[in-house]
């Protein structure tokens, strides 16, 4: 628990202190955000706001993760794990794709960065590598970071995926989550605040898995997760970094995370869900992100098949703006819905454990 608190504190400190430095630097360099022309009229005043703030989030996560482990090693703790490094590696790779996308948008002074093919290839490459490596690095108990068995809050023994299918499943998860967070990042602080809550929920889940790991506490309800404590540190670092960034990203935002941050944070959710064996539960925890990306898919399908739109604009947070909700109202209400979803997800996780132990 001490390491988790250190991870949150370090990430928050780095993020909240580095972000204003980036604001000044990016402002001097003219790294301003471009606004989509067909977006809500109230958003045009945001044109020129510095972007690529995801650099501060990733920096906060990495400094926190490595710093916490240095402290842990001094206190006879363990070093970084395969699971933790895989999740952070995935997030960083996606963050690099997002950074290139953001940079191209800025250079071209328009809201169009990497073309769809290049961006998709970058995301798929990161996802494929993650999926392949997730089934490597078996520990003394034979546990690998990922499991070919589909998972709800633990592995579903009746649904086992072939290695190749598992890798493809990881590709779908990574692509879906990275795009989901990316679509959600359209209002000041919305994605950062929601991510902080989802990551906080994952801290509780992975720490509980650590306290009830089959390797140390065999018995009813134990969890076969390779590195649960290290995953808790990753989740704690991500939560702290998002909170620190939110200080500057809250409405009216002084900086945006850009694709650098949104793609990386989508990778955090995808990576944590695979390595903690909670791929299905993650849909509940990240219900806001799921709803946002679903609204885009529904809008596209409806328009292509009927020629009509379901929402005034997608993602659907813009729909609520266009029907008269103030931006801050949308943000706060969506945060509340995220808090409810996270609470429900944690309750489902704990309820399954109670059932497993026969309580």
Curated annotation (Swiss-Prot):
One of its GO terms (cellular component) is plasma membrane. Keywords: Cell cycle, Cell division, Cell membrane, Cell shape, Cell wall biogenesis/degradation, Magnesium, Membrane, Metal-binding, Peptidoglycan synthesis, Transferase, Transmembrane, Transmembrane helix. The chain crosses the membrane at residues 3-23, 55-75, 84-104, 120-140, 156-176, 187-207, 231-251, 255-275, 280-300, 334-354. This is Phospho-N-acetylmuramoyl-pentapeptide-transferase. Its main location: membrane. The gene is mraY. Its EC number is 2.7.8.13. Catalyzes the initial step of the lipid cycle reactions in the biosynthesis of the cell wall peptidoglycan: transfers peptidoglycan precursor phospho-MurNAc-pentapeptide from UDP-MurNAc-pentapeptide onto the lipid carrier undecaprenyl phosphate, yielding undecaprenyl-pyrophosphoryl-MurNAc-pentapeptide, known as lipid I. It is an enzyme of class 2 (transferase). Coiled coil: none annotated. It comes from Mycobacterium sp. (strain KMS). Its cofactor is Mg(2+). PANTHER family: PHOSPHO-N-ACETYLMURAMOYL-PENTAPEPTIDE-TRANSFERASE, PHOSPHO-N-ACETYLMURAMOYL-PENTAPEPTIDE-TRANSFERASE HOMOLOG. It is found in: Cell membrane. The keyword Isomerase does not apply. It catalyses: UDP-N-acetyl-alpha-D-muramoyl-L-alanyl-gamma-D-glutamyl-meso-2,6-diaminopimeloyl-D-alanyl-D-alanine + di-trans,octa-cis-undecaprenyl phosphate = di-trans,octa-cis-undecaprenyl diphospho-N-acetyl-alpha-D-muramoyl-L-alanyl-D-glutamyl-meso-2,6-diaminopimeloyl-D-alanyl-D-alanine + UMP. One of its GO terms (biological process) is regulation of cell shape. It is a multi-pass membrane protein. InterPro entries: Glycosyl_transferase_4 (IPR000715), PNAcMuramoyl-5peptid_Trfase (IPR003524), PNAcMuramoyl-5peptid_Trfase_CS (IPR018480). One of its GO terms (molecular function) is metal ion binding.
């Amino acid at each position: 628990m001490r390491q988790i608190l250190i991870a949150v504190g370090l990430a928050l400190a780095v993020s909240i202190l580095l972000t204003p430095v980036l604001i000044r630097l990016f402002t001097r360099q003219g790294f301003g955000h471009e606004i989509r022309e067909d977006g809500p009229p109230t958003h045009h005043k945001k044109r020129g706001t510095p972007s690529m703030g995801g650099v501060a989030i990733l920096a906060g996560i990495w400094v926190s993760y490595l710093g916490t482990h240095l402290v842990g090693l001094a206190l006879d703790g363990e070093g970084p794990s395969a699971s933790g490094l895989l999740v952070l590696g995935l997030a960083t790779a996606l963050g690099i794709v997002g950074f290139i996308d953001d940079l191209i948008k800025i250079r071209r002074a328009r809201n169009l960065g990497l073309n769809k093919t290049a961006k998709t290839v970058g995301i798929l490459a990161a996802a494929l590598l993650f999926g392949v490596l997730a089934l490597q690095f078996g520990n003394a108990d034979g546990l690998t970071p990922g499991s070919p068995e589909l998972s709800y809050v633990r592995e579903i023994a009746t649904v086992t995926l072939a290695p190749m299918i598992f890798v493809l499943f990881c590709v779908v998860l990574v692509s879906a989550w990275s795009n989901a967070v990316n679509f959600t990042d359209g209002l000041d602080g919305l994605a950062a605040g929601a991510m902080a809550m989802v990551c906080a929920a994952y801290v509780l889940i992975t720490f509980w898995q650590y306290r009830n790991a089959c390797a140390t506490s065999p018995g009813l309800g134990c969890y076969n997760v390779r590195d649960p404590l290290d995953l808790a540190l990753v989740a704690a670092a991500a939560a702290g970094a998002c909170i620190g960034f939110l200080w500057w990203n809250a409405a009216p935002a002084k900086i945006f995370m850009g694709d650098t941050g949104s793609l990386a944070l989508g990778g955090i959710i995808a990576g944590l869900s695979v390595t903690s064996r909670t791929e299905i539960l993650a849909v509940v925890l990240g219900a806001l992100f799921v709803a946002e990306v679903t609204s885009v898919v529904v809008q596209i399908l409806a328009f292509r098949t009927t020629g009509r739109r379901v929402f005034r604009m997608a993602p659907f947070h813009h729909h609520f703006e266009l029907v008269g909700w103030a931006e801050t109202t949308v943000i706060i209400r969506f945060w509340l819905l995220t808090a409810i979803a996270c609470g429900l997800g944690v309750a489902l996780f704990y309820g399954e454990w109670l059932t497993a132990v026969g309580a």
